Amino acid sequence: MQMSEIETKRLLIRGTRESDGPACLEIWLDDEMGKYMADPPKDKADDAELNFAVGIENQDGWYPMVVFHKITGDFLGTCSIVPMDDGKRWDFGYAVHKKYWRQGYATEILQKLIELGKEKGVKVFSANVAKENVASNAVLKKLGFSVWKDTGSYRKRGTDIIYSEYTYRLEI
């Protein structure tokens, strides 16, 4: 499903297009940037993962988006909304390119998605984060999220790496 373009002070967020695939994969399959993502390392990615963007504009059940700097047009990262509980809760995913780490972009992205959700009547937001991912844990806490569940885990596809995770929740 496609989301309308969203703007923040510094960012333009829009629905992912097939042509965005290579930029997304640069983050997700990178050893450093994708370290805590479930996506496999580049050398372990299969054809389905490498071609994830084919037909993405027509997929249902979630809103995959890409993020650009409004002034420079630089690709900054990705984010997504997955409506849960009949749309009463939005689950977020996000990734920022390492060139833009520690500049407040993840916070700005999530602030805007929360604002959009509130406008649409969503009252609960969530996100799953590896316990080891210090930066993402800090972003969610800064935005008022608290740990809802701390018993989950996931395996990084194509590897034997298993991460323990927190599920964060924010109720408005």
Label each residue range with its predicted role.
Residues E32-V54:
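Conserved GNAT-fold acetyl-CoA-binding loop/helix
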Residues M1-K35, V66-I172:
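Acyl-donor (CoA/ACP) binding surface of acyl/acetyltransferases
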Residues A53-V66:
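A short helix-loop-beta-strand connector motif used in the catalytic cores of GNAT acetyltransferases and
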